[in-house]
């Protein structure tokens, strides 16, 4: 079986349906004896340019190992699902299991925010004890 990287974008009004879509597409892959190496829900993000007069979309990334029939079925599902505004399936040489740069950047921002919150609360505590 070959390895694929799949990214699809969902209409922002349909964001609440994304977990169900992920579950359905994952079942398609695992039902065809495929494996999912990485699944990332990037959430709602700004588009680089408008697509169908939309400026935001909900992004999902999948790295899978699956037979061609499963990939063909996924692409057909993407094509006939009106909520999916764009999709891209790329073949890759090997399974990618590490976190994507998008998730790494998000984690770094979260850590910086938490560090800043801890510093400000420490400063506030130190200011209270000096009085």
From Swiss-Prot:
GO terms for biological process: translation. One of its GO terms (cellular component) is cytosolic small ribosomal subunit. Binds together with bS18 to 16S ribosomal RNA. Belongs to the bacterial ribosomal protein bS6 family. Keywords: Ribonucleoprotein, Ribosomal protein, RNA-binding, rRNA-binding. It comes from Erwinia tasmaniensis (strain DSM 17950 / CFBP 7177 / CIP 109463 / NCPPB 4357 / Et1/99). The keyword Ribosomal protein applies. Residues 104-116 have a biased composition (Basic and acidic residues). Pfam families: Ribosomal_S6. One of its GO terms (molecular function) is small ribosomal subunit rRNA binding. Residues 100-131 are annotated as: Disordered. It comes from the Bacteria. The gene is rpsF. Residues 120-131 have a biased composition (Acidic residues). This is Small ribosomal subunit protein bS6. InterPro entries: Ribosomal_bS6 (IPR000529), Ribosomal_bS6_CS (IPR020815), Ribosomal_bS6_sf (IPR035980), Ribosomal_S6_plastid/chlpt (IPR020814), Transl_elong_EF1B/ribsomal_bS6 (IPR014717).
